Amino acid sequence: MAFETVFRETLDDGEPYEKFDTFLAGHMTHGRLSIDGIFCVTDKVAYYVMKALRRMNLRIPEDVQVIGFDGIRQLGDFDYICSTIVQPVEEMARISVGLLFREPSSARLHTYCLPVTYVCGGSTREPAP
């Protein structure tokens, strides 16, 4: 299986997503998208990606899978459901605050590996059992 990064533009939460719409349109051939999965940095970006895909009459997850990466499940549209990677935000905050209050001399660099959880929200296909 080959992975390819095909979209490197930065999309801010407040800006229109015309760049992404143009990108998607450029990857359509005979009504099909040439990619089958989109990984989004946040669930809010996943929400806008899913809206763009639906405007193009693409089915999620049958035609293209979408996954977010923060665990926010609802953004105002009642039909919004997205598969996501839930991050342990409280633990991330606790560790970060602890690091900020350390004395500079004791602030050795450490790597923290925190557990995340996959939550199926209907925008990814589930593997066969």
Please report, for each region that a protein language model flagged, where it lies by residue.
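Bacterial carbohydrate/catabolite-sensing allosteric modules
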Residues: M1-P129
